[in-house]
Every structure is written in C-alpha cells, then in structure tokens.
Regions:
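N-terminal secretory/membrane targeting signals
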Residues: 1-27
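Sequence/fold signature of self-assembling virion shell proteins
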Residues: 2, 23-97, 112, 116-119, ...
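Charged, low-complexity, helix/coiled-coil-prone segments
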Residues: 77-100, 131-149
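Hydrophobic, aromatic-lined core segments that form the binding pocket/scaffold
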Residues: 102-106
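Short acidic, glycine/tyrosine-flanked loop/strand segments centered on an H-E-D-like triad
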Residues: 110-136
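Alpha-helical scaffold segments that mediate packing/assembly in large oligomeric complexes
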Residues: 129-215, 223-237, 350
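A structural signal for short, well-ordered beta-strand segments and their strand-loop junctions
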Residues: 218-222, 262-263
C-alpha cells in the first residue's frame, strides 16, 4: 500500500514539476504534453459539450443575414417530401354562412406541390492545441463556442446566398409581380425627379394585395438600395420634420406602411471581389415569420430544416493536425411556397 502511495506521489510530483518548468520557460511543451495535458477531453466530456454547442449553433443569429424574414424556418422530420404550396384561395375571405340542413363548407390549406430534398451542409471548426496552450485551458465551452459560431457563420452565409439567389430570380415571379428599374427610374437618380421609391413600393404592395388579399409585411433592401432610399429627396421630404438626424429602417417601414424593412448587408467573396449577396434588388413579400412549428400557414417562402439542426457533432482530436475538431451539420433548403405573395424590384439602383 505504501509503495503505491509513493508511486502516485512521484507521478504527481513529476507532472507538477514539468508543468512548472513549462510555465517558467525552461522547456517547451511537446506534442505529447499538448495532447495528454491540454488536449485531454474525454469522450464523456465531449458528449456533455455537444448539446450545449448545438444549442449555441441553433440560437446563433448574424444581424447581417435576413433570409429568415423571407424564408422562415419550418422544422421537418424527413429529408425529403412535397412542398406545401399556397394559391390565392389560401389568402381570400370565405363565406362561412350555413343554411339549416346544408353541408358545411370545407377548406383545405395549401396543396402538395413540387418535391423538395434537404441539402446537407457540413463544416468543421478547428481549435489547434497551440491556441489551447496559449490560453492555458483545456478545450471546452469557450474555445468550442468560438469554433462553432465562426463555423456556423460561414454556413449561414451560404444559406443567405442560396435564399437570395432564389428570391432574386425573376423566373420565380409572374409578370405582374416583378419590375426592373432603369435609367432615371432608379432610386439613386436624384436629379430627374422621376424616380420614386415610395411609389415603387406602393405598386408592389398593391400587386400582392390584389392577388392574395393581404398586404405584404416585409421589405428586404439590398444595402445599395437602402443607401439610395435614405438619401432620396422625395423620402427626405416626407420625414424632414422628424427629430432623427438620419433615416432608419424603422422610419422606412412606417413610410412604406409595412411591419418590417430590413437591409441584407451580407457580402461574399466572388472570385476575389467582395460582392453584396442581395445585389441591387428589393424584395417585397408577405411572410409568416412566426411559423417555426406550423408549415400550414400561407407565406411567400419557407426554409425546411431537419429538426434538431444545426447540430454540433462530438468533438474529436486530430492528432496529425494537433487540433480539436468541431463538426457542424445543417440540413435545410429554402423554397417558395406562394410566389403570388412576393414582388421583385430588380436593379433598384445603378
């Protein structure tokens, strides 16, 4: 018994001595120390972190991203199925009167349209052992959270770009639900007196209302369109008596008479050129943002996402790269459910 105690004491003394010498700068921690001391998270510990980091990924929001305003998330349990699409009948007022003995009218909300298939998006965040050494801590919530949020930000950018590509595709709209501004009609023409952002939004609102019986509640502006709008003489003239020094998105929402106006400020690297995800366009739509658990509510679009995603898988050590790896998976796809509830204004600015 005494010999075992002496052995344990010797091992403990050796570890403390090595640690003290490393902190004092007498020796450099080698790979074994990085893996055995700083990088020593057991599988049980990793399993504890996984649900926490999955919650981080699921709750993470980037203020530059606005896709969810046009394509609110609907959790699904299958990776494929039919899009629940909506026609004009889903938005119109019904005569609910019933005569004695008459049959009760039936209403079916939505119909199964084109097939959808969730797309799997997966990216792995890396935390090098060297960073852990410098931070003098084991890999856990803090560095893991940083790796997950940065990885999730990249996945969100890809999702934003995909949604913007769909929303900005003129082929997805009927002729009555799109326009392309040109020349003096563009919002950044302040001289001719012809361009009029408010009139353009009013026309979009009326086009949607006339078809689906509901006023659109969302306007997504590209950053260039937002910049042009808040500097436009006709808009400034309408708000010049307010106490604000500069025009805000909330003020534009009041002016356009919609619930929300958002600016899609995300950019991406396009062959070395930083490019606006939302280009020069404007999208007006009726969307039901509060439909996360109900896919049966009419809306311009949805993002079908596998329930429980995004998901952070069990962290593991890559000893060759001397790093902890945090895989993040997100299975989802944005779809248009009611094209008549959207309106596209292309090339709102030059």
């Amino acid at each position: 018994m005494k010999s075992k105690l002496w052995k344990l004491a010797g091992i403990l003394f050796g570890v403390l001595a090595l640690s003290a010498m490393a902190h004092a700068g007498w020796i450099d921690p080698d790979a074994a120390m990085a893996i055995g001391v700083i990088g020593n998270m057991t599988n049980a510990q990793a399993r504890v972190v996984d649900p926490i980091l999955s919650t981080v990924a699921q709750g993470y929001k980037n203020g530059r991203m606005v896709a969810d305003f046009l394509f609110p998330v609907v959790p699904v349990d299958q990776r494929g199925g039919k899009i629940l699409e909506f026609g004009k009948e889903d938005f119109l007022l019904y005569n609910t009167a019933r005569a004695p003995g008459a049959d009760t009218k039936e209403v079916q909300f939505g119909h199964l349209g084109a097939a959808y298939a969730l797309e799997g998006h997966r990216l792995m965040g890396k935390v090098p052992f060297e960073h852990l050494q410098e931070a003098n801590q084991v890999p856990g919530i803090n560095l893991g959270r940083g790796a997950v949020t940065k990885t999730q930000n990249i996945i969100l950018l890809a999702s934003e770009h995909q949604a913007a590509t769909i929303a900005r595709n003129a082929a997805n709209y009927a002729a009555s639900n799109k326009t392309a501004l040109a020349g003096t009609s563009r919002w950044d023409d302040y001289v001719s007196g012809i361009s009029d952002p408010v009139a353009d939004i009013d026309a979009a609102v009326e086009a949607i209302r006339a078809q689906v019986g509901m006023r659109p509640n969302t306007v997504v502006l590209s950053p260039k369109a937002f910049k042009a709008a808040k500097r436009h003489p006709k808009i400034i003239d309408r708000v010049k008596y307010t106490s604000r020094d500069s025009l805000t998105l909330e003020m534009l929402a009041d002016l356009f008479d919609v619930e929300r106006v958002v600016s899609g400020d995300a950019i991406y690297n396009n062959a070395g050129t930083m490019t606006d995800v939302w280009g020069k366009d404007v999208v007006v739509a009726y969307t039901e943002v509060a439909t996360a658990d109900d896919g049966g509510v009419p809306s311009f679009g949805y993002t079908y996402r596998l329930r429980g995603n995004p998901m952070v898988e069990m962290a593991y050590q890559d000893r060759n790269a001397k790093s902890w790896i945090y895989p993040v998976t997100d299975e989802r796809v944005p779809v248009i459910a009611a094209a008549a509830a959207g309106y596209l204004i292309q090339t709102a600015v030059s």
